Regions:
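Short glycine-rich, Thr/Ser-proximal phosphate-binding strand/loop in the N-terminal lobe
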Residues: 2-47, 80-83, 157
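Short glycine-aspartate micro-motif
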Residues: 3-7, 62-67, 132-136, 175
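Small-residue (primarily alanine) positions within well-ordered alpha-helices
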Residues: 5, 67, 117, 143-144
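Short glycine-rich anion-binding loops that position phosphate/pyrophosphate groups of nucleotides
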Residues: 11, 71-74, 138-140
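Short glycine/serine/threonine-rich phosphate/pyrophosphate-binding segments
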Residues: 12-14, 115-117, 140-142
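Glycine/GP-enriched mid-protein hinge/lid loop-to-helix segment characteristic of carbohydrate kinases
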Residues: 16-19, 29, 37-40, 108-110, ...
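Glycine-rich phosphate-binding loop and adjoining helix at the ATP-binding site
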Residues: 34, 38-46, 50, 61-66, ...
Length: 200
């Protein structure tokens, strides 16, 4: 059996095709181009998945699961992205859409920072720990919380949305619409915006 992992970011979509031992057989990436319709983003994701399947020489039916790690609040039970401020997703059925556009039957979805935290808890830096916290930096700033070896999703699936913790009341404008969020200061986007302001 084969598996596909998708890292959907605000800047790039990265896809890897692995075998049952977790060996990466093929990987690729394309720009996300986040300023367009959600279906267009997922069509590019599906095309990249299908390209890798073809390059490895297997059939779509040989892929047991695809897993999508995406920013934002994610209802992993329904396969929906409830909200993502760096992507145009609002109550968007991302799992069903990847199935529709690629033919991959089983698609799992998780918040990207939660997926990274779970990966570290299973096989990485926090292996053997019951509880851990991971902070992810990229286009945005996220967090994954592990309690008793399980991902803590919190209220409305936003337990790890550390980037939207207000650290300065009335501070810098965040892409979520609030002011003073940690993400507005410490994400790549926040650092770029602060640099532009200083150079202006």
């Amino acid at each position: 059996m084969y598996y596909i992992g998708v890292d959907l970011g605000g800047t790039n979509i990265a896809v890897g095709l692995v075998n049952e031992n977790g060996k990466i057989l093929k990987k690729g990436s394309v720009p996300t181009k986040a300023d367009r319709e959600p279906d267009e983003i997922i069509k590019d994701m599906a095309a990249l998945c299908l390209d890798l399947i073809k390059e490895v020489g297997i059939a779509v039916g040989d892929v047991e699961y695809a897993g999508i790690a995406t920013p934002g609040t994610v209802d992993h039970d329904s396969g929906y992205v409830v909200y993502a401020n760096n992507l145009p997703f609002l109550n968007y059925p991302i799992a069903a859409k990847l199935t529709e556009f690629s033919g991959i039957k089983k698609v799992l979805v998780e918040n990207d920072a939660n997926a990274a935290a779970k990966g570290e808890a299973e096989m990485g830096a926090s292996k053997g720990c019951n509880d851990s916290l991971m902070i992810t930096l990229g286009t945005g700033l996220g967090g994954g919380i592990i309690i008793d070896k399980k991902v803590y999703s919190g209220f409305n699936y936003a337990g790890g949305e550390l980037g939207h913790t207000v650290i300065e009341v009335g501070g810098r404008q965040c892409s979520c619409g609030r002011k003073g969020c940690w993400e507005a200061y410490s994400s790549a986007t926040g650092l770029i915006n602060m640099t532009k302001d200083k150079l202006a």
